[in-house]
């Protein structure tokens, strides 16, 4: 019988390189927020991949970037702490974008913070480009990371090469116990996941100014008194300015209703029951730069 292996794996890369989508594809359920806005992942969410002879715990981090606000600095510190504690780091570089200074900076950061941690290259989004572009990108990544680096091309969307990536990750993990019971997919509390799902719905299709300015706090979750099959969820969406409040709510509240419907469907999937979702929007001026507000909003 093969020895059971287990350990922690962290995907890193510029914002929007497919890290969260990859986490969700490997786990087989949505545990990380995915959005085509950079810097949308804020909490270290652990997705858990179970098989008979191994367990991979995926640590999801915000994309590393040069910080402009106190929130940005805190997010970067969180990423760096994570780097030094995991068994394997997978650096994600999309097949459809040339390697740039941002990728080189991140590679240097990883090597500075965690020089001894196993690092593999992951070329993501290979379904978006022809095979020769994938081959060229593999070569470019190998030039960045050195000739000995293991590099795996994958598509989280189509599932191509996911099994190959899983095998490569497992081969680098130490023998160890299962840290989580079988069937558990994440150790994030449900309220954190609910807040993330609402945030994801609110970010969908809005202008670039909003992502970093939006925080979601779950105010209350309760069972409806007269019904066993209904849970009431009350949440507050915090923005920094009046103009942003208008963007979130939309004309006559239309956009907020859309957000509510999309988020409710996802939360019902998460909880496995019907949900009544009540959303309110409030202003917390410049919360990203204010340590007190950051603390209150969970950062």
From Swiss-Prot:
Start and end residues of each stretch annotated as G3: 60-63
Annotated region described as G5, given as residue ranges: 154-156
Pfam family, one: MMR_HSR1
MF annotations from Gene Ontology: GTP binding; GTPase activity; ribosomal small subunit binding; rRNA binding
Keywords for this protein: Cell wall, GTP-binding, Nucleotide-binding, RNA-binding, Secreted
Annotated region described as G4, given as residue ranges: 124-127
Compartments reported by the entry: Cell envelope; Secreted, Cell wall
Transmembrane annotation, as ranges: none
Chief localization: other
Activity regulation annotation text: Co-purified with RNA upon overexpression in E.coli, but RNAs do not appear to influence the GTPase activity.
Location of region: G1: 13-20
Gene Ontology biological-process entries: ribosomal small subunit assembly
Chain residue ranges for the region called G2: 39-43
PANTHER family: GTPASE ERA, GTPASE ERA, MITOCHONDRIAL
Family assignment from sequence similarity: Belongs to the TRAFAC class TrmE-Era-EngA-EngB-Septin-like GTPase superfamily. Era GTPase family.
Function of the protein: Exhibits GTPase activity. Binds RNA but is probably not involved in ribosome assembly in mycobacteria. Cannot use ATP.
Quaternary structure note: Monomer. Stays in the monomer conformation, irrespective of the presence of GTP.
Name of the featured protein: GTPase Era
Native source species: Mycolicibacterium smegmatis (strain ATCC 700084 / mc(2)155) (Mycobacterium smegmatis)
């Amino acid at each position: 019988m093969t020895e059971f292996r287990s350990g922690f794996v962290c995907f890193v890369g510029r914002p929007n390189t497919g890290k969260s989508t990859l986490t969700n594809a490997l786990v087989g359920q949505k545990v990380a927020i995915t959005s085509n806005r950079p810097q949308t992942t804020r909490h270290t969410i652990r997705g858990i991949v179970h098989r008979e002879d191994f367990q991979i715990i995926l640590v999801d981090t915000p994309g590393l970037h040069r910080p402009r606000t106190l929130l940005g600095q805190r997010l970067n510190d969180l990423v760096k702490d994570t780097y030094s504690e995991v068994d394997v780091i997978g650096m994600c570089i999309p097949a459809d974008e040339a390697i740039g200074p941002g990728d080189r900076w991140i590679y240097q950061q990883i090597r500075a913070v965690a020089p001894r941690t196993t690092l593999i290259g992951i070329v993501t989004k290979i379904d978006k480009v022809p095979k020769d572009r994938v081959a060229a990108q593999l070569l470019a990544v190998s030039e960045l990371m050195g000739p000995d680096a293991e590099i795996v091309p994958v598509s989280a969307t189509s599932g191509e090469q996911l099994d190959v990536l899983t095998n490569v990750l497992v081969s680098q993990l130490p023998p160890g116990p299962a840290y989580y019971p079988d069937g558990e997919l994440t150790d994030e509390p449900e309220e954190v996941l609910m807040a993330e799902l609402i945030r994801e719905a609110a970010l969908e299709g809005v202008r670039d100014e909003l992502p970093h300015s939006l925080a979601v706090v779950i105010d209350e979750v309760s069972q409806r008194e007269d019904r066993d099959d209904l849970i009431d969820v009350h949440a507050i969406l915090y923005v920094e300015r009046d103009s942003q409040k208008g963007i979130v709510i939309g004309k006559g509240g239309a956009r907020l209703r859309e957000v509510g419907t999309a988020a409710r469907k996802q939360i019902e999937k998460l909880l496995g029951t019907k949900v009544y979702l009540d959303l309110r929007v409030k202003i917390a001026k410049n919360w990203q730069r204010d340590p007190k507000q950051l603390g209150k909003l969970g950062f």
